[in-house]
Amino acid sequence: MNITAIIPARFASTRFPGKALADIAGKPMVQHVYERTARARLVSEVVVATDDDRIAQAVRGFGGRVEMTSRDHETGTDRLAEVASRIGAEIIVNVQGDEPLIEPAMIDEAIAPLAENPAVRMGTLKSRIRTLHDFLSPNVVKVVTDLEGYALYFSRSPLPFFRDKWNDLKDESFASGRLLCYKHVGLYVYRRDFLMEFAKMPPTALELAEKLEQLRALENGCRIRVVETAHESIGVDTPNDLEKVLEKLK
């Protein structure tokens, strides 16, 4: 089975321009993501998708494969679909280009349900929420799943609402495991044919309200398999996030 991981990488970024090329221990960030992704056991090939010549040159410089894409894409999924349309992979993995500490095992965990069950068309990850701050933060996307591990909903709001415990919530409630709730980890796996369908679907009401593209799949009746991971990663959205990554690598 051909499983290709695609890393969308843009130079433009509102909060951290050029972050894909930010230096981390002598390598650009995109190289760290590429090399860690290539170590995933189930991944056959890794490709960087970009519309920027500087990023393309950097990727070629470390021997990576790069595919140039249109500058007109509104979402990362559109960029992903453009590259997927050119390659013969059966399964496409979308690895965020700003996750330089991503664990290869996380990628394998997300792929496994699609590799094992042809009925699964889309998959992603979740991890335990361990602080009250994360539970309440709109920047931490929450997910709830059914008993078979399929997503019921994703939201920036606290989810679920613990009606009887709301006034007593504190960090210890989450750290101890007494309250089990989960944050979404933004790594996606698609069957190629579904990705091509998904990219053509118009934005949906809940997607636009929450600014969460995966809700488009749910609103169109696609079941999303969500696997719990014990691994953690750090997304680099700001220079401050980069400092956290550098601290971890010391």
From Swiss-Prot:
Keyword Transferase: yes
InterPro entries assigned: Cytidylyl_trans, KdsB, Nucleotide-diphossugar_trans
Pathway given in the UniProt record: Nucleotide-sugar biosynthesis; CMP-3-deoxy-D-manno-octulosonate biosynthesis; CMP-3-deoxy-D-manno-octulosonate from 3-deoxy-D-manno-octulosonate and CTP: step 1/1; Bacterial outer membrane biogenesis; lipopolysaccharide biosynthesis
Gene3D superfamilies: Spore Coat Polysaccharide Biosynthesis Protein SpsA, Chain A (3.90.550.10)
UniProt keyword terms in alphabetical order: Cytoplasm, Lipopolysaccharide biosynthesis, Nucleotidyltransferase, Transferase
Compartments where located: Cytoplasm
GO molecular function: 3-deoxy-manno-octulosonate cytidylyltransferase activity
This protein's GO CC annotations: cytosol
Keyword Nucleotidyltransferase carried by entry: yes
Primary residence: cytoplasm
Reaction(s) the record says it catalyses: 3-deoxy-alpha-D-manno-oct-2-ulosonate + CTP = CMP-3-deoxy-beta-D-manno-octulosonate + diphosphate
E.C. designation(s): 2.7.7.38
GO process annotations (BP): CMP-keto-3-deoxy-D-manno-octulosonic acid biosynthetic process; lipopolysaccharide biosynthetic process
Function summary: Activates KDO (a required 8-carbon sugar) for incorporation into bacterial lipopolysaccharide in Gram-negative bacteria.
PANTHER family reported in the protein's UniProt record: 3-DEOXY-MANNO-OCTULOSONATE CYTIDYLYLTRANSFERASE, 3-DEOXY-MANNO-OCTULOSONATE CYTIDYLYLTRANSFERASE, MITOCHONDRIAL
Membership in a protein family: Belongs to the KdsB family.
The protein's name: 3-deoxy-manno-octulosonate cytidylyltransferase
Classification lineage: Bacteria, Pseudomonadati, Thermodesulfobacteriota, Desulfuromonadia, Geobacterales
Gene: kdsB
